[in-house]
Every structure is written in C-alpha cells, then in structure tokens.
UniProtKB/Swiss-Prot annotation:
Official protein name in the record: Taste receptor type 2 member 38
Record's keyword annotation contains Glycoprotein: yes
Function in brief: Putative taste receptor which may play a role in the perception of bitterness.
InterPro entries in UniProt: TAS2R (IPR007960), TAS2R38 (IPR030050)
UniProt keywords, alphabetically: G-protein coupled receptor, Glycoprotein, Membrane, Receptor, Sensory transduction, Taste, Transducer, Transmembrane, Transmembrane helix
Lineage: Eukaryota, Metazoa, Chordata, Craniata, Vertebrata
C-alpha cells in the first residue's frame, strides 16, 4: 500500500512562494482570457458580427476567468486557513466543488467547438454526416445554448447535492461523539461529491474525443490525397486541420493534467495530509487555463492581428517619446 509522510504544515517561505506563483498564474490567466473577451466584446460594440467560433471562444474565456478566480481563492484558503490536521473546511470544499462545475462547463464548450471544427473542416462523403455537419453549422448557437443549459442543470444538481449532504453530515456530527467516525463520514462525503460532480463530464468528453478523432482521420486522408496530387506550397485545408488539431490536443492535454491534479489532490488532502503536494497540484491546475488561452491567441488570426496592432502602437509611442526627449537638446 502506498504511504506518504504527512506534511501537516509547510515553511513560511514555501507559503510565500506558493502564493506568489498563484498570483502570477492568476494575473497571466486573467490578462490572456480578458484579452479574448475584450476583443470580441469590442467587435460587438462596433456592431461587427461574431462568427460561431468567436462566440464559443468568448464563452470559454468567460468560464476561464471564473476558473482562475476560484483557483486563486483555493490557493489562499489552502495556504492561510486550511490546516492539514483539521477536517476540510466547508469553504475549501465549496471552492473545489465550484471549480469542478466550472471546469465541466468549459468541457462542454470545447466539445461544441470541436463539433464546429468538424463541420467546417472535414469533407464528408456520406449523406448522413453531410446533413449532420450542415445542421451543426446552421444550429450552432442553439446547440451552444443547450450545452450551457445542460451544464447549468448539472452544476445546480452538483451544488444542491453538496450543500444538502454537507448539512446532513453536520447534523449527524452534532449528535455523535465519535470524532474519528465523523471524520471518515466527512471524507466519504467529499469523495462522493467529487465523483457526482464529474459524472456530467462523461457526455462532453465522449463528444470531444469522437470529434477530435474524426479530425485526425480527416487530416490523415488529406495528407494521403496531397501526396497523390501536385499542390502548391500553401494549402488552406491543411492549415485549418492543423490549427484545429493543435487547439483540441492542447485543450485535451491541459484538461487531463488539470483533472488528474485535482484527482490526486483529494487523497493528498484527506488521507495523507500532504500540504506541499496539494500546493503543487493547485499550481498545476491554475497553469492550465492560462496556458491554453495563450495557445488560443497564438492560433487565432483576429487575436494575433490585434496584438500586432497593440505592439505597433506601443512602439510608435516609444519613438514619439524619444523624439520629444531629443528635440529640446537640439533646440
């Protein structure tokens, strides 16, 4: 059986370093995701129509902003208030439950976006996939609303189960004097809440994996077609395939890392009481939304154009300042 040495507390320097890293990850994630939100929101203010991909990215970035805030609260709660020798505080469990719910919403949005990529990029030869792809393109906004509604229902059920179960556990603990038995009940309650909240992630995970697999197969078929034909140096279809797969694979990697870190943090919290290990897990969870937002920006033509414009404006301002500093010396 795997045993770890309990680390009930960590040094003051480790706490400061952990909080500093958490604030840096929070700042990077907020700037990256807020940039995506502001660019698309500004287009809406200028009454420029947003395409389906922009709308999905806007919703995904708003969810990521909420995730980053929850993870910062999680880090502060762990470093400053949660003692490993004590039972998990209700606030800490509530923050983790909200994080799992928000993470599930982001998974639904990514699944919808992967379906949109399939509908726009993959060239189907059979009738049913063609009709399905056409339906996804025409009804994407309705599909997105249904996904958000379903994830909202799952979130409401998860929160209702968590708070009602927590109330039941607190009531039973007040009527029982067996401290060890009460702790075991609370651990089982938190583990059950974790499992229950992630049951709703199964359907979007299947949709995401199937659509990603279809894109990979389509890319392989396209590469074989290119080998048998003489094509120019630039292939828009190949570029679209590669950009979509980079987005999907990066999201999958970040999601798996984040989910595994959250899963590992549970036994570290309730069984092994290893505070240092939990800090590492939370740091990994916080790095995922900001890292994926950076990949989204680097692969989106509109967002890259805005960044280039901002950099050009900043360089122009710097040149103007230098000129104003040099002119008084000349005169």
């Amino acid at each position: 059986m795997l045993t770890l040495t309990p680390v009930l507390t960590v040094s003051y320097e480790a706490k400061i370093s952990f909080l500093f890293l958490s604030v840096v990850e929070f700042a990077v994630g907020i700037m990256a995701n807020a940039f995506i939100v502001l660019v698309n929101f500004w287009d809406m203010v200028k009454k420029q129509p947003l395409n389906n991909c922009d709308i999905a990215l806007l919703c995904l970035s708003i969810t990521r902003l909420f995730l980053q805030g929850l993870l910062l609260l999680d880090a502060i709660q762990l470093a400053c208030f949660q003692q490993m020798k004590d039972p998990l505080s209700h606030n800490y469990q509530a923050i983790l439950t909200l994080w799992m719910s928000a993470n599930q919403v982001s998974l639904w949005l990514a699944a919808c976006l992967s379906l949109l990529y399939c509908a726009k990029i993959v060239r189907f030869s059979h009738t049913f996939p063609l009709h399905l792809a056409s339906w996804v393109s025409r009804r994407f906004l309705q599909m997105l609303l249904v996904a958000l509604l379903f994830s909202g229902v799952c979130t409401a059920l998860c929160l209702w189960d968590f708070f009602s179960r927590s109330h039941t556990v607190v009531t039973s603990m007040l009527h029982m004097n067996n401290t060890e038995f009460n702790l075991q009940i609370e651990k089982l309650n938190f583990f059950y809440s974790f499992v229950f909240c992630n049951v709703g992630s199964v359907p979007p995970s299947l949709v995401f994996l199937i659509s990603s697999g279809v894109l990979v197969i389509s890319l392989g078929n396209h590469m074989r077609t290119m080998k048998s034909q003489t094509r120019g140096s630039r292939d828009p279809s190949l570029e679209a395939h590669v950009r979509a797969i980079i987005f999907l694979v990066s999201f999958l990697c970040f999601y798996v890392v984040s989910f595994c870190a959250a899963l590992i943090s549970i036994p570290l919290l309730v069984l092994w009481h290893n505070k240092g290990g939990v800090m590492v897990c939370i740091g990994m969870m916080a790095a995922c939304p900001s890292g994926h937002a950076a990949i989204l920006i680097s692969g989106n033509a509109k967002l890259k154009k805005v960044i280039v414009t901002i950099l050009f404006w900043f360089q122009s301002r710097q040149k103007v300042r230098r000129v104003h500093k040099v002119l008084p010396r000349i005169l």
